Amino acid sequence: MMHFNDIDDDQIRLIGEPNKEPRPKRRWWIITAVAVVIATVISVIFLCSQNDCEEMYCENPLFYCEASDGTAYIYDGVAETRGYTLITDTTINDIPLRAYTPYGATMSLHIGALNKNDSTIVYAARAADIRADNGGIVGAFVLNGEPRAWGISKKGYCAAINGKVVIGVAKNTHLFELATEQGGYFFRQYPLVSNGKLIENEPKGKSIRRAICEQQGKIFMVETITRESFHDFAQALVDIGADNAIYLTGSSAYGWAVDQNGIKHEFGEDDYYTGKLKMPKNINYIVWRTRVTP
């Protein structure tokens, strides 16, 4: 009779407690960790959609940021109620620049004095130059479909037709006629950048410089904080990535921008508005107005 302690050479004795069901603690720990990761990702996406992650998509601080689908999202909540201008400062080639990017606004042209209390204006700056001899506008100019001046003394142009702004350089362009036919706007100025290439201009000397620029369809205005030459200013615009740019009347020319907080930022000198100087009858401006009345 074999006892419990007896074992043959061809037998194996198992020592230990009987098998038990595996404990599910490790499995539940993994599930919990995965759930936490998913919740974190969802939270980040939600916060970004609430405008808390602007800098994640901002490669160039001069321009407004875009979400991955290409839609502007910085201060979208503000843009839905009123337009504004995003104001940003940077330095390129030791030249301090200030950029103005309009949101929720449409560009047009204006001749004559502006109403400084007009709450629909989010950006205004002098556009075409004025002749010193007869006070006429230099270069072709179309105001709400009406030609007010003709000529190609300067090859740079800016057109605003049906809400779309086009900046370019050409001796002849169909946009003058198109602006006339469709109630649009058109003016000419010195060309600064064409297809990403610097364009030299004859005027020398240094002054506060301004320009209206386009980069991949985005429109923004830039001014220098210090007095600069045409060449250095144009080079700075090339270096910030402007595809096309033309000049805006600089020096002490008056204008202003309204930021996302409703604060008005004036530049230049308002001598024409205080009566210190007589205002030219053909003084003209580019004007960005909010699409939604405040």
Residues of each region from the PLM?
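Zymogen propeptides
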Residues: 2-150, 222
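Short, surface-exposed beta-edge/turn micro-motifs
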Residues: 97, 119-122, 153-156, 163-164, ...
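Secondary-structure transition/turn motif
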Residues: 103, 168-174, 224-227
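Active-site-adjacent helix-turn-beta-strand microarchitecture at beta-sheet edges
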Residues: 125-126, 131-197
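Conserved, well-ordered active-site substructure
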Residues: 135-152, 205, 214, 218-244, ...
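Conserved beta-alpha junction segments in alpha/beta enzyme cores
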Residues: 187-211, 216
